[in-house]
């Protein structure tokens, strides 16, 4: 009985930790800085010349899937972790999913992240996301946004960088709200609007209209 009780306690503690991680990120979800300035810079790149990719490129060449999408029960008041986590050593290269442009990025967080660390928002990304890249890409004539979080410092490509599928866009780190080295990845299906059209109308929402926390489960994308 004692073993069963200890196991249940450990599982509850893990769920509470996971919920807190999701809530922290949800508190800061809007790009910082001048959105109009960003749009002007993106427009000058001529994104309509980017050719659509024929499929998704794997984000890493090594590592393991350490977490998928979690949904927490009422015993911890709900909560959600959207996307997936790939655990690998610090410095492992992260590759672009497809041809596109870095719509937003954040750098300047150290690689000594911990649970509750809010670094990322002041650097231009989401709170707790550490060093991060938001890639706007076209794959099979469909536009997607791909979010990569918790990168090593000085590795994220800068906003406005045009990339090809498979180009390195950063490296795995331990920045922001984490307990170990990994990259958190989310994919948002945005429709058939061109890259340039989407970028010019983007509101700065780093959840791309899908919502954050439990609200993210109420949208299909």
Language-model-derived ranges and their functions:
Residues 1-53:
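Alpha-helical oligomerization segments with coiled-coil/rod-like character
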Residues 52-101, 105:
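Domain-scale macromolecular recognition modules
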Residues 79-81, 96-153, 181-189:
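Zn2+-dependent peptidoglycan hydrolase active-site motif and core
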Residues 84-85, 165, 170-171, 182-188:
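Active-site scaffold segments
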Residues 93-105, 156-172:
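Short, well-structured beta-strand-loop connectors
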Residues 141-142, 154-164, 186-221:
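Acidic, glycine-rich catalytic/binding loops that coordinate metals and/or anionic ligands
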Residues 178:
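Glycine-rich phosphate-binding loop
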């Amino acid at each position: 009985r004692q073993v069963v009780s200890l196991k249940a306690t450990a599982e509850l503690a893990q769920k509470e930790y996971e919920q807190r991680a999701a809530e922290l990120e949800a508190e800061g979800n809007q790009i910082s800085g001048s959105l109009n300035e960003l749009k002007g810079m993106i427009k000058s790149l001529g994104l309509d010349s980017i050719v659509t990719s024929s499929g998704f490129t794997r984000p890493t060449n090594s590592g393991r899937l350490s977490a998928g999408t979690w949904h927490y029960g009422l015993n911890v008041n709900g909560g959600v972790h959207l996307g997936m986590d790939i655990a690998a050593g610090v410095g492992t290269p992260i590759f672009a999913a497809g041809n596109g442009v870095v719509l937003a990025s954040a750098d300047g967080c150290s690689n000594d992240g911990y649970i509750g660390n809010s670094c990322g928002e002041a650097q231009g990304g989401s709170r707790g996301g550490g060093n991060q890249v938001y890639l706007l890409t076209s794959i099979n004539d469909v536009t997607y946004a791909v979010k990569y979080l918790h990168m090593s410092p000085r590795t994220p490509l800068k906003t406005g960088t045009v990339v090809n599928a498979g180009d390195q866009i950063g490296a795995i780190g331990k920045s922001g709200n984490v307990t170990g080295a990994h990259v958190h990845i989310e994919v948002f299906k945005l429709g058939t609007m061109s890259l340039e059209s989407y970028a010019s109308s983007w509101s700065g929402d780093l959840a791309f209209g899908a919502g954050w926390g439990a609200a993210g489960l109420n949208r299909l994308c």
